[in-house]
């Protein structure tokens, strides 16, 4: 019996075509924390340096050491002031400091009942509205995404999940256990990773799951080769760790829709 196989190919403006890299020369803004900071915390080259080398991306770096998601609103506003019309894509790479700061997860929406015209008749329907604010992690993401969506309606936004957390000590009053431990409100880092994944659907943004796809796992000593210091800092990737992050991103960008 002869079998017929139907192949359906979706043709779009993918970012690698004809052997040419369509990301070359594109300006990409990077919002985030120490892993994005241009001062190179724990490394001499960040993931965005490697993306520049691999794909020819022009980096616009706004990440600041220690910043939580609530601080990225200020980074986004600075981006808007400095590059109102010439940024091609935006990366958001944060959340690990929100976990460390014991930030409650919160809710995306608050729900009410409102009367509205439906098919010519006034009916009472449930209605949801975004919860904004700095008190919760979801509220902080809503704050940030509102600014980004209103300021950059045409630019793709990429949400990166935090990498796994290893042990780190930066002094007697700044000792951070590894991710085997919940924070002081009982939440593991996984919960913050999951919220960022949810945000992709809530805000129509592309999620790149660096937590999974980078392969970085600082809970094991064998992964010390990818981190700043085996004894004192298994939190910040070194150059080798950043290159793995960059490659995980590059794999996704090579097959994504062009900015």
Task: Annotate each PLM feature.
Residues 12-13, 43, 166:
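Alpha-helical transmembrane segments and their juxtamembrane interfaces
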Residues 72-74:
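Short gly/ser/thr-rich secondary-structure transition/capping motifs
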Residues 38-42, 61-70, 108-116, 234:
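Acidic/histidine-rich helix-loop elements
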Residues 54, 76-258:
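Alpha-helical cap/lid subdomain in secreted, periplasmic
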């Amino acid at each position: 019996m002869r079998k017929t196989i139907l192949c359906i190919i979706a043709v779009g403006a993918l970012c690698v075509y004809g052997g040419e890299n369509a990301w070359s020369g594109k300006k990409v803004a990077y919002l985030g924390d120490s892993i994005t900071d241009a001062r190179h915390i724990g490394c001499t080259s960040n993931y965005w340096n490697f993306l520049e080398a691999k794909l020819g991306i022009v980096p616009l770096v706004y990440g600041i050491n220690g910043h939580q998601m609530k601080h990225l609103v200020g980074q986004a506003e600075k981006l808007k002031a400095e590059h109102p019309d010439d940024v091609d894509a935006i990366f958001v790479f944060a959340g690990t400091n929100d976990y460390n700061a014991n930030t409650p997860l919160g809710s995306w929406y608050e729900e009410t009942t409102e009367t509205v015209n439906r098919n010519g008749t006034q009916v009472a329907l449930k209605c949801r509205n975004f919860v904004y604010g700095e008190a919760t992690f979801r509220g902080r993401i809503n704050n940030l995404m509102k600014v980004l969506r209103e300021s950059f309606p045409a630019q793709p936004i990429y949400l990166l999940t935090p990498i796994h957390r290893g042990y780190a000590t930066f002094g007697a009053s700044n000792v951070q256990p590894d991710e085997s431990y919940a924070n002081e409100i009982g939440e593991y880092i996984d919960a913050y990773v999951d919220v960022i994944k949810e945000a992709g659907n809530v805000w129509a943004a592309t999620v790149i799951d660096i937590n999974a796809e980078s392969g970085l796992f600082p809970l094991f000593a064998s992964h010390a080769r990818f981190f700043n210091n085996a004894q004192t800092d298994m939190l910040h990737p070194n150059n080798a760790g950043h290159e793995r992050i960059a490659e995980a991103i590059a794999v996704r960008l090579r097959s994504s829709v062009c900015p």
